[in-house]
Structure formats: C-alpha cells, structure tokens
Amino acid sequence: MSPSVSVTKVQVENYVFPPTVKPPASTKTLFLGGAGHRGLDVEGKFVKFTVIGVYLEESAVQFLAPKWKGKSAEELIHSVDFFRDIVTGPFEKFTRVRFILPLTGKQFSEKVAENCVAHWKATGTYSDAGSRAIEKFLNVVKSETFLPGASILFTQSPLGSLTISFTKDDSISEAGNAVIENKQFSEAVLETIIGEHGVSPAAKCSIAARMSELFKNSLF
C-alpha cells in the first residue's frame, strides 16, 4: 500500500479485521474500508449475529476523493450517494462476513436473497438475470453450516463477477468456491450491507469515519 492509503486494523467484538488482505481470486491487496456488527432485535433484545469487514482496492481513494474529500464522517454517513459510489465504483471490493452466532447456509442465503430482491423491487431493477443469480447463490450456500468464527467471503470484481468463498477460521484461500457472473447481484450484496437500507449501520459508520480521514490525507 502507498503512504497515501495507510490504514489500521479494526476489532469488532472478538474478531480482528487486518488492515490489508489479498482476497480469493484476486491478484491485488485491498485495504480495510471499515468494519462493524450486524444484529437484529429479538424479543426486545438486540442480538449481534455477524461482524462484517469491507475492503477496497487502493484506486478507490483516487476515484472517490475528488467528490468526497473535505466531507466529515458525519456528512458521509448520511450520504446515500457516497455509499452508492463505493458499491458501483470501478474498483475491486472484498467483504468478509464472520459469524458470532451459528447459522445454517440456508438461513443466511435466504436472508441475503430476500434483501437483494427487496432492493431491486424498491429501485425498479428486478430482472430475470438477477433472479437466476440469486438461485445460483442459494444453491452454493445452502449446504454450508456457519459456526462461530466461520466466514463467508465475497470478492467483487469491477467487471461484474462475484467470487464466493468459505472459511472456518482466520484464513483466506487463494481460490473461491464458486463464481457468479452477474454484476447486478454482485453490487446488490454490498448494497444490502452498506447501502441506504444496509443491514450494518455500524460498518457504515466505520467506513465513513475511516474514509473521511483517508481523503483528508490523500494526494488526490
């Protein structure tokens, strides 16, 4: 990483997201944009299910800075366009979802699919191709079991492919378990995490704070 993209690790609950990673199916080293938990209210109590780290290719800073440099973390966290620019930007992204509580692949994949479809219907972008991508995703993930500490990894190419990988510990494999060639679905997975109705407001806050500082110190 260049000095202009100097980043630190982030700890969420008992899990540490390192400052840089080399994702599966990628030749590049990505930096940690931010990380946070994802939880739900269960019978009146907030329960944390996963922790999520979002990594970006270094060129993301060069792409985003001209528009967003000078904005505070508070301004970025409330900007739908800022997170949309991250989701759709022409650079590689990598998302690691680590499980705090055990979930079956069926439970996890059906919730992701539900959120993606809701996003597409809300934006009028639901398509047959997107629906087929979701079916493939459900088939890839449904037989998995995610115990505490396990992860599902998403490597998102700017060309549109989504590489899905699984790991039971801190490791990251070089190759993925499956590839889905559908840009709409690839973007929707990240959109439903950090977009306008994203499931992890904590990750959004972390990204806004860290990226605001990176822009401030960037040469772009």
From Swiss-Prot:
Its EC number is 5.5.1.6. It catalyses: a chalcone = a flavanone. It holds the Pfam family Chalcone. Substrate binds at residues 50, 115, 192. GO terms for biological process: flavonoid biosynthetic process. Keywords: Flavonoid biosynthesis, Isomerase. Belongs to the chalcone isomerase family. Catalyzes the intramolecular cyclization of bicyclic chalcones into tricyclic (S)-flavanones. Responsible for the isomerization of 4,2',4',6'-tetrahydroxychalcone (also termed chalcone) into naringenin. This is Chalcone--flavanone isomerase B. The lineage of its organism: Eukaryota, Viridiplantae, Streptophyta, Embryophyta, Tracheophyta.
